[in-house]
Amino acid sequence: MRLTRCWAALAAAIILNLLVFFYVSWLQHQPRNSRARGPRRTSAIGPRVTVLIREFEAFDNAVPELVDSFLQQDPAQPVVVAADTLPYPPLALPRIPNVRLALLQPALDRPAAASRPETYVATEFVALVPDGARAESPGHLERMVEALRGSSARLVAAPVATANPARCLALNVSLREWTARYDPAPSAPRCDALDGDAVLLMRSRDLFNLSVPLARPLATSLFLQTALRGWAVQLLDLTFAAARQPPLATAHARWKAEREGRSRRAALLRSLGIRLVSWEGGRLEWFGCSKESARCFGTVAGDTPAYLYEGRWTPPCCLRALRETARYVVGVLEAAGVRYWLEGGSLLGAARHGDIIPWDYDVDLGIYLEDVGNCEQLRGAEAGSVVDERGFVWEKAVEGDFFRVQYSENNHLHVDLWPFYPRNGVMTKDTWLDHRQDVEFPEHFLQPLVPLPFAGFMAQAPNNYRRFLELKFGPGVIENPEYPNPALLSLTGG
């Protein structure tokens, strides 16, 4: 049957409407990032840079806007959003091959490679972009790459125009002393670390050769590792825009983010072995042991703590506890009229630099046995363990006939009190340990006692303490430091 012109026109109209309908439907199902709302510029550098977004809060963020802003500059821009676990609420990310979500916490149903961030980065460079930034001006990544290529620095940074833009800091990290110290940068814009919001660009191989490349807080973790390696960061005269709808806009969201940030930072620093941070301006922040926690090391074998084998000295929190305990014990002894003096390694530390030896793990004091009865705490310790009003624990040591004062019931950093008594002009005692310095000595070293700076206060010491120390340890002991048991581990590496 032949179709009339009317039927043909009707069929054509239906087909045209169907085509329009399917096209509009297809557009609506495309990711919003793939539909440019303005002119787009394809970057010649883009394929060599991966945008990596790690620092954001799952409960309140502007990550979709951030991703969208980079895709508007270059639809082919590789973007990786990294999180420990699947973010909740879910992130509204475009479902396109060059935008990927990396979950870093291992899971039973995923291969090991899926938890390694380098699996998701195939480019020469990586840009670490914080939440709250926005790619608004074309070519920023290209300029950062060129700046990195032309610099001796291993990282370059561009501030983000937020309320807290990045600024330069100097950073000194000492693993041996468990410390990190921040100061004003002497040669900005070249610095060791940054404080504030910035986009960081570095070579991918450098990032993924770090011990923990994406640990949070990211900036804290990253700069501790790069400063330790001597890698400088160059702060560029280049600014990224802030998000149009910035994250953490409410007071509650900011409070929650700050609380979780503090918790993450403390966990990070403890895991990296940093026990003390000195912030710019001199504020100290401690991340080690306290009266409420156990000390930072376990039982000592062979007079050589485990940390010495790791190339470290006594953690600063432990030294602080020893200083506090020593000052307190000396105050109690002096108030009770108990004659005491610095002994052993503690006297050696006082003679060298007026403090505890930096790898020592206790404090030793000698006391006159006949004065023990003058001190209420020592009398109580004769019968059993005594916890005084300051939380210090006074007790008889299980190793022999001497006293021990512990920092607390939880923290067993301690001061040992060795009771001596005179016999024919020689100071002796009833308990001897297998230490070279544990020997008798003439009483004239104690007549009189002399004041000596030690651990932040003035303590009593034997007169002619150099001869006293050389009697116990050997000639030249003050000038030639050595670990307590060089047969096991020597300071000189022999």
Curated annotation (Swiss-Prot):
Entry coiled-coil feature ranges: none
Catalytic activity: 3-O-[Rib-ol-P-3-beta-D-GalNAc-(1->3)-beta-D-GlcNAc-(1->4)-(O-6-P-alpha-D-Man)]-Thr-[protein] + CDP-L-ribitol = 3-O-[Rib-ol-P-Rib-ol-P-3-beta-D-GalNAc-(1->3)-beta-D-GlcNAc-(1->4)-(O-6-P-alpha-D-Man)]-Thr-[protein] + CMP + H(+)
Keyword Chaperone appears in the UniProt entry: no
Location relative to the cell: Golgi apparatus membrane; Secreted; Cell membrane, Sarcolemma; Rough endoplasmic reticulum
Binding residues for Mg(2+): D360, D362, D364
TM annotation in the entry: 7-29
Tissue: Expressed in the retina, specifically in the inner segments of the photoreceptors, the outer plexiform layers, inner nuclear layers, and ganglion cell layers (at protein level). Expressed at highest levels in brain, lung, heart, kidney and liver.
Cytoplasmic side: 1-6
SS bond list: C168-C191
Enzyme Commission (EC) number: 2.7.8.-, 2.4.2.-
Ranges in the topological domain labelled Lumenal: 30-494
Listed PANTHER family: FUKUTIN RELATED PROTEIN, RIBITOL 5-PHOSPHATE TRANSFERASE FKRP
Primary role: Catalyzes the transfer of CDP-ribitol to ribitol 5-phosphate previously attached by FKTN/fukutin of to the phosphorylated O-mannosyl trisaccharide (N-acetylgalactosamine-beta-3-N-acetylglucosamine-beta-4-(phosphate-6-)mannose), a carbohydrate structure present in alpha-dystroglycan (DAG1). This constitutes the second step in the formation of the ribose 5-phosphate tandem repeat which links the phosphorylated O-mannosyl trisaccharide to the ligand binding moiety composed of repeats of 3-xylosyl-alpha-1,3-glucuronic acid-beta-1.
Oligomeric and partner information: Homodimer; disulfide-linked. Forms a complex composed of FKRP, FKTN/fukutin, and RXYLT1/TMEM5. Also exists as large multimeric protein complexes. May interact with the dystrophin-glycoprotein complex (DGC).
Listed name of the protein: Ribitol 5-phosphate transferase FKRP
Organism: Mus musculus (Mouse)
Taxonomic lineage from the root: Eukaryota, Metazoa, Chordata, Craniata, Vertebrata
